[in-house]
């Protein structure tokens, strides 16, 4: 297994330009493919999850050309008419590709099979499939009920009224919303339970609106989408920088001192994970806000007790910031960490204890008391990009650390360790 040794970093200084947002990149690619006309997508993220979406779209007959850096894509939309692929669509462990494609392919004519990595077969999709079947969708499980892989015969959905559980993953609702304009009739979606990660739904609604589709909702409890609609291409669309990726550099400046300018997200960001910067201000970081950039400096860091339901991905970074804060930190309402790339709640608790922290792992919360003494250990990353990037913060705090399987960061931020080195002193 490959390992990366990170020596202590005394301070950070410089400027970071963020890669494009994963959440936005895959939503935009899919809607550009479904649209009538050609869309140029700029600042596209080049990562494993995006490559899985691009590979699937090309098998579905969508013509996509990329620049040499793979950050600008020219997508020739097919107007909602895909060809039946000759082979299964392999989507790795990319939930932002697998879930929306499940719903969209159920809505358009053709026969499709969606497969993925072993971890994808452990990530639940039953709530989405139940909703699509209730609307007339023809979807069968190839192995285990409620989990991928799936076989789909598309074009059977007429619309109607359906309820979907919002408490596990917002990606189920995102998938339904993106597919609903393609259904033959109008659709009313009612949310059961508490909707998690609500800001990710705002991203979905924002992107749909830019491609010409309006969704009515009553305070996120019900959503109404007219059927028989067509997405309209945009000449050009810019992918905002990834706010989840920004969290590591906000944290680095807050922990180590120095000053980091983060370009690509700011006060005008549409991503919920920008809320991490507001949490870090509560912790003690000093942040200057501009429309499309942040400037972050160190402050006296104190433990906090927060509900992180709106920022689940970025909140992981807070768990390693907690190692360097004064007093304990509690991160609550994060059950959906358990159904991500790995069971992140258990994984983070395990690795934080290795470093020397006292940790309480609850059903949907984690409490962290900083170490009295830091252990020089190798961090297992569980094939989870965010765990690798989070624990790099230990080195930023002036303690040596080893990261196992550092290339797992290729899922969202292939150049992460190089970028961190470029601002480290």
Swiss-Prot record:
Enzyme Commission designation: 2.5.1.19
GO biological process per UniProt: amino acid biosynthetic process; aromatic amino acid family biosynthetic process; chorismate biosynthetic process
Superkingdom, taxonomy of origin: Bacteria
GO CC annotation: cytoplasm
SUPFAM superfamilies for this protein: EPT/RTPC-like (SSF55205)
Pfam family, one: EPSP_synthase
CDD domains: EPSP_synthase
Residues forming the catalytic site: 313 (proton acceptor)
Binding annotation for phosphoenolpyruvate: 22, 95, 123, 171, 344, 386, 411
Pathway: Metabolic intermediate biosynthesis; chorismate biosynthesis; chorismate from D-erythrose 4-phosphate and phosphoenolpyruvate: step 6/7
Subcellular location: Cytoplasm
Similarity annotation: Belongs to the EPSP synthase family.
Subunit: Monomer.
NCBIfam families: aroA
Purpose of the protein: Catalyzes the transfer of the enolpyruvyl moiety of phosphoenolpyruvate (PEP) to the 5-hydroxyl of shikimate-3-phosphate (S3P) to produce enolpyruvyl shikimate-3-phosphate and inorganic phosphate.
Protein's name according to its UniProt entry: 3-phosphoshikimate 1-carboxyvinyltransferase
Species of origin: Pseudoalteromonas translucida (strain TAC 125)
Gene: aroA
